[in-house]
């Protein structure tokens, strides 16, 4: 990713090396938070003096703070207004404190950007909008809600959007991402796709990357993307529902050998609660209208899956700050350190929106 030399020079003037300056620029611009592992991967270095020197510089100049979630692991936050102002990013909200849900999402987004640093990434929602409208000629009124209650098309900071100039296509490919940092089902992902369908349909070509630490939902996400955005796969899904109904009703004589094989493969393909919900609606002739191929679809796109290792080594399986809930000897529970906010579990709806 190209970075202006004057901005790197400003960071070097604080005493940071070239590699440290590039890393800190990416963190400040796209995340605000980072871990030692991310820096070491970026610097292609082993744990030791390299990361120790970086952290010492950050602390000595008041550019960062650290929050410990497990005994030997920290998340570092670039919060210094002076550092952000120095690179012309004083307006970014990354320097502010955030809840844990936001932090985990930003760390995964940074994982993606560091792994694909050859791409160019937009730093603000305004920059994303300008590229779509001014360069790709997307009608600007597409970002307004429609009379039918369609939500605003959003370009959230937590989902990196970039441009790949290494594409085999004649024109650069715009890249959208969805960072699934919570794994509470695909309900939020489906809402995100529905909200942005009009935008995707207006593009000549685009790539979409589903970033996740859990592989169990990735194939299901690919099927959902094909149905809602690419307008394909509905015929197979409806055929599966029809055969499943006959099988469940013990009408085995109505199934050919090929149909039994298709049904068996469909059971492996259509897993997950969302397909159970769609089957429930199909039996009542209430399938969502946006599954129809004549809707806002664009088959001229590429869907990709990316599995990142995540940050369980930092947060553990239960996210809380190290020391939360400890009792001070001789004190009451009321005097113990306050408990940290926890992730609120979301429930996947049993019915899709009709």
Q: What are the residue ranges of the model-derived segments?
A:
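Basic, Lys/Arg-rich alpha-helical nucleic-acid-recognition elements, primarily the DNA-binding modules
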Residues: 1-87
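Hydrophobic, Leu/Ile/Phe/Ala-enriched alpha-helical segments that form helix-helix packing faces
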Residues: 27, 43, 55-59, 112-120, ...
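Glycine-rich, often proline-containing surface loops adjacent to acidic residues and nearby aromatics
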Residues: 33-35, 85-93, 169-177, 206-207
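Short flexible/disordered coil segments
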Residues: 63, 91-92, 128-145, 195-203, ...
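A structural signal for short, well-ordered beta-strand segments and their strand-loop junctions
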Residues: 77, 123-125, 208-211
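Short, amphipathic alpha-helical interaction segments positioned at domain boundaries
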Residues: 80-107
